[in-house]
């Protein structure tokens, strides 16, 4: 057990006393936490009034842009398009286009990747298949050179979009691997195919599900690596563009936490044993290296590993046990803080989804990963603006934005969506505006004290 300083004990007892007496009007005081000096303020009220989340698109159900009305009707009649079986999962942004993935969870999904214009011209547009209809295969007559079931994407600084195509259809009924999982890359300037790479069979386990992808660019655009998460068999696949080769990375921190595997949302109770999922890459000033921040979906913790460990292929061809020490936990978000995806801004602000809380959170990566340094934004009871935030991206604009897809996935999987109301949303917020009054603003010098003293003791002092 780590010892507590007398100052921290007194601070927490005073806070507990005021909390029990119902007196929450605490004047700002200066205190030191983890080597930083802060002004104690409750920042959550400021965030609620200035959340700055803006609805870009919303749908009761999805539609696709067919060449003619007759083609659309024919697709519905033959079962290729069943509107209620389509759900948006992944989001990405490049210039004046949004990219949305629609994996083939069920029958009747005609295309698994499409685009939408930005700025929007209407509130609920049909999705235009990307790059065209011909690029998408039919699961009833599979052509594995085509796109089958794209889960998520990554846009890099070289104007390319990277896709992870799971090759799995009907995952909600009977997991059917009809094509090998593959990485596909398109040139966003020409929309031409650049790369199609099937993951090596020896790296794909029984019931593997490859569901997320991030990309690291070195000194030039050829020095690129994609990192793909295997959420059901708890591994990472690293692909080298220059070598056109991949390797599998394993570590016990990729596994789900049983205590975080129980979900209770929207009146539904279910268990997800999803392993490593959320990933983002940034330069860590403390160790002076680029790192991969990651977390399993069924977890309350965040981890990191130096990128040079992941990108060294020879490490993963020998005894990997000696490298386990480089995969380290950096902090805990707290109970019911499961997160799917994350993204980091150019100045080191990480945003992450909070799927159990219908919210997004943030963290300034230059500060310790403790709950005192984690912010929330939406944080409003009885609001349906966000319902299961499933994917999140930070764009590459000069004035950056954070983008979010809310899609009610558990209801889609385990119950029935009400198609008389809005089920899916794409939302965005300007980064500078949304963090202005938050603990995540690097220019602010206060911490999150809007929780009980018991949480402060649990997270910061007694391990």
From Swiss-Prot:
Pathway: Pigment biosynthesis; melanin biosynthesis. It catalyses: dopaminechrome = 5,6-dihydroxyindole. It is found in: Secreted. GO terms for molecular function: dopaminechrome tautomerase activity. Gene3D superfamilies: TolB, C-terminal domain (2.120.10.30). It comes from the Eukaryota. Catalyzes the conversion of dopaminechrome to 5,6-dihydroxyindole in the eumelanin biosynthetic pathway originating from dopamine. Catalyzes tautomerization of dopaminechrome to 5,6-dihydroxyindole during eumelanin biosynthesis. Acts both dopaminechrome and N-methyl dopaminechrome but not on dopachrome or other aminochromes tested. This is Dopaminechrome tautomerase. It comes from Drosophila melanogaster (Fruit fly).
